From Swiss-Prot:
PROSITE patterns for this protein: GLNA_1, GLNA_ATP, GS_BETA_GRASP, GS_CATALYTIC
Superkingdom of origin organism: Bacteria
Positions that bind Mg(2+): 113, 115, 174, 181
Name this protein carries in UniProt: Glutamine synthetase
Coiled-coil segments: none
Subcellular location field: Cytoplasm
EC number: 6.3.1.2
């Protein structure tokens, strides 16, 4: 027998990488990740190589059922390697794997809230051509054809993620018309990142069938309209047991150069979204607070009440690389917790 394997990878486009994929026909029974062959592609067409030395290598790192094709067909997320099998410069997963392994004993886990916006014919869904809809207010978690746009795509995407076995944990309509969110986690750093990249691919691929485009642009409409983020919820074993560890983690993100070190890697266009308006903190200031959606980092009220839990970094853009944001949070917070003896 044969089956189709859709090899998916992250390209070298700057400042925001794109997803690419192509299909390999494999003979035999599906036998898991380790049985999948490495493959290759033309890196000169993906901003990952020069034409005179264009070969790049695809190494499978995660696989799941293909919910669109069905049957025995699979999706295969890959790392990009050089031909000497070292990580390619665009491969951010390899660096996360090292940091995640170093701090594995602290048991870090993540939940990421992926916001995105639907466009059709150059306009956000729900925006009249050449004009604007009613101001924000009734769209968030709304219901009804006058306030909700694209639900058929959202439901199809949710079903596809569930069929694929991804760790998707919810969906909701967002503040701007045509803007939605899905959540992945809580799971380990590598798992949340792998699953989010595949969920993004499924979002684009599902929307294709509806002749709709999905964008992770952090500020898709200028003016008094919310941007799109990827709020990143994070905890360690100590944070899930102690409020002191929560404070240590929140404080560590504001120390020295850490605020800028993080923000400059939280997605292109961060200054367009983090203005201090529309439930954001200014990009060049750091703050944290309980139940404060205008802070850089929010401590949920339930966490303060329970004396344990997690923090929400509200700064990452919708277009952030999850391998990068999880690596930075694990490195900064786990280092501080280790130094404080809160492990």
């Amino acid at each position: 027998m044969t089956f189709k394997a859709e090899y998916i990878w992250i390209d070298g486009t700057e400042p925001t990488a794109k997803l690419r994929s192509k299909t390999k026909i494999i003979t035999g029974q599906p036998a898991g990740l380790d049985a999948l062959p490495i493959w290759g592609f033309d890196g000169s067409s993906t901003n990952q190589a020069e034409g005179h030395s264009s070969d790049c290598v695809l190494k499978p790192v995660f696989t799941c059922p293909d919910p669109i094709r069905g049957g025995d067909d699979i999706l295969v997320l890959c790392e990009v390697l050089n031909i000497d099998l070292t990580p390619h410069a665009s491969n951010t997963r390899a660096a996360l794997a090292e940091v995640a392994e170093r701090f594995a004993a602290q048991e870090p886990i993540f939940g990421i809230e992926q916001e995105y916006t639907f466009f059709q014919d150059g306009y956000p869904l729900g925006f009249p051509k050449g004009g604007f809809p009613a101001p924000q207010g009734g769209y968030y978690c709304g219901v009804g054809a006058d306030e909700i746009f694209g639900r058929d795509v959202v439901e199809a995407h949710l079903d596809n993620c569930l069929k694929a076995g991804l760790a998707i944990s919810g969906i909701n309509a967002e503040v701007m018309p045509g803007q939605w969110e899905f959540q992945v986690g809580p799971v380990s750093p590598l798992e949340v990142s792998d699953h989010l990249w595949v969920a993004r691919w499924l979002l684009y691929r599902t929307a294709e069938d509806f002749d709709v485009a999905a964008t992770l642009d952090p500020k898709p409409v200028k003016g008094d309209w919310n941007g799109a983020g990827a709020h990143t919820n994070f905890s360690t074993k100590a944070m899930r047991e102690s409020y002191d560890a929560i404070i240590t983690a929140a404080e560590s993100l504001g120390e020295g150069s850490k605020p800028l070190d993080h923000v400059k890697n939280y997605g292109a266009g961060i200054d367009d979204r983090l203005t201090g308006l529309h439930e954001t903190a200014p990009w060049n200031e750091y703050s944290y607070g309980v139940s404060d959606r205008g802070a850089s980092v929010r401590i949920p009220w339930q966490v303060e009440k329970d004396g344990k839990g997690y923090i929400e970094d509200r700064r990452p853009n919708a277009n952030v690389d999850p391998y990068v944001v999880t690596r930075l949070l694990v490195d900064t917070c786990c280092s501080a917790l280790e130094k404080a003896g809160q492990v």
